[in-house]
Structure formats: structure tokens, C-alpha cells
């Protein structure tokens, strides 16, 4: 069953999401409609995460190399600059490229919940695809977030603002949680965690 805002708020008070915003924020200053932000916080049946400003990496082409998920070469990634102007802080994701960021919020997924991460409509309409995998029962940490820019234009990816939406699905209790099996991505810090086996 998909969980609602009442459940999300209750579980957040028990530490499921930190820091937590109990309502959907669309303006940093509620009285100043001139300064909108990409919404974040609790919505009717989900939670909009923010992108951390701490790190954003972009894949680069190194002639003659092939990426290997069993032996990932971090040299295939390059750090990007955090830019700032009157619209806010942002990274640039080049056209037809792939980037990795990290969620500002830390999560602690309950043992009977699986979390699915999907894109936000504002970014989707610019060709940005969120390709983040599920957060399983018992997983804890900062999600590493994956993005593809499928458009032919560079795109701003705003930091400290909404980047994707989490959906919380409740299931029957499982016999082994992600924490029980000592999953390799458990307790990810607020930095990009690279592929590992």
C-alpha cells in the first residue's frame, strides 16, 4: 500500500527523514512569490527530496576505456562547480550526459517499507531523467542520486531544492532486511557513493 502524508509525518517524527519538512515548500520566503524554488517536503503521497550542494559528479569520456561495474574507475567522473546567481545555487549537467549527486536528507527506511524514487515534473519536462534505484527495507543513509540529461541542451540542476520524489510502499514483513544482510550501500554519507560489488 502507498503511504500518505499522515504516515510520512509520523515516521519522520521517529527519524525516518532528517532534516524533515512537514509541508511542501514552494518559496523560501512565503510572502515573497518572486523567489520560487523547486518544491521540496511532504506532499499528499510522497516526499520531495533536496539535492545536496556538497558534491555533483559528471561522467566523462576517456578514449579507449570501457566502464566496468565490477571494477569501477573513478577517473571516469569529474567534479562540477557549484554556481550561484539570483535564481539560486546550481550545477550544470551538460547535454546528453549523466551525473551523480547525493540527497541532502538522510533516510532510515522502516523494516516493512520499500521506497521508490521518481523524477519531478519540472525537470522531466526539460529532459532530465532520475534513475535512482529503490531504498530497501532497513536501508539507512543519504541516497546517491543518478541523473541523465536526454536533451540537446545543458541544464541547471539546483542544489538545496527539490530534485526527486520518494514513494513509500508498505509490504508484509520480510525475513531479511537490507541491514540484516549487511548491504554494501548501507550508511552512505552525504557524498556520492560509487558503484561497488
Please describe what each predicted stretch is.
Residues 1-197:
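DUTPase catalytic domain/fold
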Amino acid at each position: 500500500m502507498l503511504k500518505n502524508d499522515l504516515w510520512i509525518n509520523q515516521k519522520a517524527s521517529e527519524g525516518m527523514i532528517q532534516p524533515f519538512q512537514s509541508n511542501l515548500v514552494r518559496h523560501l520566503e512565503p510572502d515573497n512569490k518572486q523567489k520560487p524554488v523547486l518544491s521540496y517536503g511532504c506532499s499528499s503521497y510522497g516526499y520531495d527530496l533536496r539535492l545536496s550542494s556538497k558534491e555533483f559528479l559528471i561522467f566523462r569520456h576517456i578514449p579507449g576505456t570501457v566502464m566496468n561495474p565490477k571494477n569501477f574507475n573513478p577517473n571516469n567522473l569529474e567534479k562540477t562547480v557549484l554556481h550561484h546567481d539570483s535564481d539560486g545555487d546550481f550545477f550544470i549537467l551538460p547535454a546528453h550526459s549523466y551525473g551523480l549527486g547525493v540527497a541532502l536528507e538522510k533516510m532510515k527506511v522502516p523494516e516493512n517499507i520499500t521506497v521508490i524514487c521518481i523524477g519531478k515534473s519540472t525537470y522531466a519536462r526539460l529532459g532530465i531523467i532520475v534513475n535512482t534505484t529503490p531504498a530497501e527495507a532497513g536501508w539507512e543513509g543519504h541516497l546517491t542520486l543518478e541523473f541523465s540529461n536526454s536533451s540537446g541542451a545543458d541544464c541547471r540542476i539546483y542544489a538545496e531544492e527539490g530534485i526527486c520524489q520518494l514513494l513509500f510502499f508498505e509490504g508484509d514483513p520480510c525475513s531479511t532486511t537490507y541491514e540484516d544482510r549487511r548491504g554494501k550501500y548501507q550508511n552512505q554519507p552525504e557524498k556520492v557513493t560509487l558503484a561497488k560489488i
